[in-house]
Amino acid sequence: MRKQRIVIKISGACLKQNDSSIIDFIKINDLAEQIEKISKKYIVSIVLGGGNIWRGSIAKELDMDRNLADNMGMMATIINGLALENALNHLNVNTIVLSAIKCDKLVHESSANNIKKAIEKEQVMIFVAGTGFPYFTTDSCAAIRAAETESSIILMGKNGVDGVYDSDPKINPNAQFYEHITFNMALTQNLKVMDATALALCQENNINLLVFNIDKPNAIVDVLEKKNKYTIVSK
């Protein structure tokens, strides 16, 4: 029976414990253990952010060119990808890091052929360097990788938030939680699920989103087993 294909979008912030750390290897190892468990049932693709190492807000403070800043962000995701690959290798998980920019000594090219081979081998795919182009978000990258791998779901791991609300629950204690919303609702009400380009790509390719709190213990495993609170975004 063909395994269901899923993409998990993990922000760089999820990989750090506090402001003084860059990569928290306890968190990396915990994520790896969860991925190892679900890889027995799913073809798993991971899209990593790099915000634990480099953030666009820093570039603005330094009055840095946007192209350069975004390229630095892409390089940051490669570092994160190698750290996660190492943790998965220790668990004997068949893993490949696929990069949108050339870095042949460290990672493989994110090409259609390499993706096809990885799926055939049932490898966990770690996608790094975003789309390879500036001005595109990690959200857009997740949507593109989901389309390329023919994944049916993107798991959107949020830091400290259980899903989608009508306003920020950290600010508004009376914020309304949504169990299910449509792509059109997310766009028209600006519900901050992911950027508009990424939402449109998901809608066009029938890729559902599952928005959940990745900071909870065993969050990825539990949300796939429907044990945790989450929001579904679909047509």
Curated annotation (Swiss-Prot):
Which amino acids does the record list as binding ATP?
Answer: 9-12, 51, 55, 159, 165, 168
**What name is this protein filed under?**
Uridylate kinase
Q: Is Amino-acid biosynthesis found in the keyword set?
A: no
Q: What keyword terms does UniProt attach to this protein?
A: ATP-binding, Cytoplasm, Kinase, Nucleotide-binding, Pyrimidine biosynthesis, Transferase
Query: Which Pfam family name is an example for this entry?
Result: AA_kinase
Give the activity regulation note: Unlike other bacteria, is not activated by GTP. UTP is a competitive inhibitor against UMP and a non-competitive inhibitor toward ATP.
Activity-pH behavior: Optimum pH is 6.8.
Q: Which Gene Ontology CC terms are recorded?
A: cytoplasm
| Similarity field | Belongs to the UMP kinase family.
Q: Which domain of life is it from?
A: Bacteria
Q: Kindly give the InterPro entries that the UniProt entry links to this protein.
A: AceGlu_kinase-like_sf (IPR036393), Asp/Glu/Uridylate_kinase (IPR001048), Uridylate_kinase (IPR011817), Uridylate_kinase_bac (IPR015963)
Q: How does it assemble?
A: Homohexamer; trimer of dimers.
Subcellular location(s): the record lists:
Cytoplasm
Pathway(s): Pyrimidine metabolism; CTP biosynthesis via de novo pathway; UDP from UMP (UMPK route): step 1/1
Known catalytic reactions: UMP + ATP = UDP + ADP
GO MF terms, alphabetically ordered: ATP binding; UMP kinase activity
Q: Which GO terms describe its biological process?
A: 'de novo' CTP biosynthetic process; UDP biosynthetic process
Paired cysteines (S-S)? none
Q: Where does the chain bind UMP?
A: 50, 70, 131-138
Role, per record: Catalyzes the reversible phosphorylation of UMP to UDP, with ATP as the most efficient phosphate donor. Is also able to phosphorylate dUMP.
EC assignment: the record states: 2.7.4.22
Organism of origin is Ureaplasma parvum serovar 3 (strain ATCC 700970)
The residues forming the signal peptide are none
